[in-house]
Amino acid sequence: MNQRPIQTATLSWNEQGTPVSEQFGDIYFSNEDGLEETHHVFLKGNGFPARFASHPQQSCIFAETGFGTGLNFLTLWRDFALFRQQSPNATLRRLHYISFEKYPLHVADLASAHARWPELASFAEQLRAQWPLPLAGCHRILLADGAITLDLWFGDVNTLLPTLDDSLNNQVDAWFLDGFAPAKNPDMWNEQLFNAMARMTRPGGTFSTFTAAGFVRRGLQQAGFNVTKVKGFGQKREMLTGTLPQQIHAPTAPWYHRPAATRCDDIAIIGGGIVSALTALALQRRGAVVTLYCADAQPAQGASGNRQGALYPLLNGKNDALETFFTSAFTFARRQYDQLLEQGIAFDHQWCGVSQLAFDDKSRGKIEKMLHTQWPVEFAEAMSREQLSELAGLDCAHDGIHYPAGGWLCPSDLTHALMMLAQQNGMTCHYQHELQRLKRIDSQWQLTFGQSQAAKHHATVILATGHRLPEWEQTHHLPLSAVRGQVSHIPTTPVLSQLQQVLCYDGYLTPVNPANQHHCIGASYQRGDIATDFRLTEQQENRERLLRCLPQVSWPQQVDVSDNQARCGVRCAIRDHLPMVGAVPDYAATLAQYQDLSRRIQHGGESEVNDIAVAPVWPELFMVGGLGSRGLCSAPLVAEILAAQMFGEPLPLDAKTLAALNPNRFWIRKLLKGRPVQTRSPATQESSR
């Protein structure tokens, strides 16, 4: 997925006050009554809002070509909110709205357009508050306490559609086929679009569109839709509506299949860190019943227990799956954390910005690669030594890259607050329950703890145990590494208190936390070491790294680590720096089933390729891990991905990036190339239980 910035919409306003696209030379909505046009063409054209009452599932999925001003979305949201108010016991509880937009509007232009509809003001304000930056790809926005999921895919719809994951196949209940008129936007209205619509639509799903153009009608019919001409809006004589009578076969990549959970009414989460808490909340938003087991006496005793952690994206300038994931993860994390703060969830934090310094030739080369992309300045910007120093409050000694939306937060505070929120929502917590064994018995998982604790049974289990993930029989083949890290807590001084931003070099230094008048500086990186004792050598090394990277200035001498205040945690790391999230793969079954995968794909006939079975996994066993040093950035999105997968929902990343997060990816990559798969060496793993 191309994460490069995209062009925003250029607008003019006609005499009626209607926005006009300069790119397409067409109006965004009717000069007569845009709101009524939306009701007639898109809602009524698909049978809504009347269809809400008879919808048989908890979630209804809409897809749209051309988000524009968001009028269709806002109108649907308002009607759904009214429906939920009038029918609180109805089966339908959530909307999922997927929209593709090539030229997203600036938020100021959105506000001007929304001013025409005061009846939508409360909904429009919430949308604008979370309006994403113009970065290509999917922006997942959660609204109405999770009752509304908005996936905004920025980019050309014809470029995006081939990249979509299998999770969107046969999912859409209703299409709003919008976009500008075919005569104004001929590139969009084509066979590829119509076929993709059919592939993504569930049997019985519908569409509506303002146009009645013959080639559109024929294209939709050829794709598999039954198409009908009906009365158009206002002076327009006709428009098209239709239904997909039967499921359309969609090609898949079965080796990266992401199965849903069979049962979400009895889920056990094993783990007590930030990703465990976020996963619990993401599941609860969908109605899941969650029980959590933590080995410690309270949450955040592992890698999530630090006082301050930096929040900023991981870029590499390669426009690959890693950069795509962390760009999406960072922007999603900021939206999630801001929403929590608005809800009154308190945790120490400062969105003060993060500056990454080019302190030597190697780091300078990396930053130059990152800046090959002309990022929006609100996301990342090249800055000189003078500019960075002015923002930081201290001489940074180097130029570098600045992330204005970054900052720091207290992982321990946040994890405790999230756990409390999940408990308020109904989650049961069992602390001091250290999982000893995991065994599948009949249709449940048996969880065995200490000798004095009774075994527990659950239908579905999620492993989120950090560096301990490889300890279980089902997961010990996964290529995960334990990495010790010691963070030093240093008292502030009049000079250090001037630091206004997080500085990243061959380490990091945070601004002072007003709550305790200390900074955090770190962190050591000891691969394969799971000890958490204090080490004087690592304490001193944390200081020395800062001095080595900024020898031109004197203020780093103010850093005093002599009181030996520190905290040590153990990260769970992966060599490709991407998390693992999804169903736990069955190692032995994967190797047996896919031993000739490369041959079948390269030399087998179409029928043989189509007969390839989905990747073997342990039933009803899921995992999230490998967040490494970037858990604050990645945890919200991986939690959302896992919950969406378990509920069988569309996922908020493209297929290539999701494949790069799949727990079986290292094995599958080798099998696809016909190479042998090597398991973890016994020397690199703890005892498997």
UniProtKB/Swiss-Prot annotation:
Keywords associated with the record: Cytoplasm, FAD, Flavoprotein, Methyltransferase, Multifunctional enzyme, Oxidoreductase, S-adenosyl-L-methionine, Transferase, tRNA processing
One Pfam family here: DAO
Cited InterPro entries: FAD-dep_OxRdtase, FAD/NAD-bd_sf, MnmC-like_methylTransf, SAM-dependent_MTases_sf, tRNA_MAMT_biosynth_bifunc_MnmC, tRNA_MNMC2, tRNA_S-uridine_synth_MnmC_C
Cofactors, names only: FAD
Renumbered residue ranges of the record's region tRNA (mnm(5)s(2)U34)-methyltransferase: 1-245
Cellular component per GO, a single term: cytoplasm
Family statement: In the N-terminal section; belongs to the methyltransferase superfamily. tRNA (mnm(5)s(2)U34)-methyltransferase family.
Residue intervals passing through the bilayer: none
Organism: Yersinia pestis
Compartment(s) where it occurs, according to its Swiss-Prot or TrEMBL record: Cytoplasm
UniProt-recorded name of the protein: tRNA 5-methylaminomethyl-2-thiouridine biosynthesis bifunctional protein MnmC
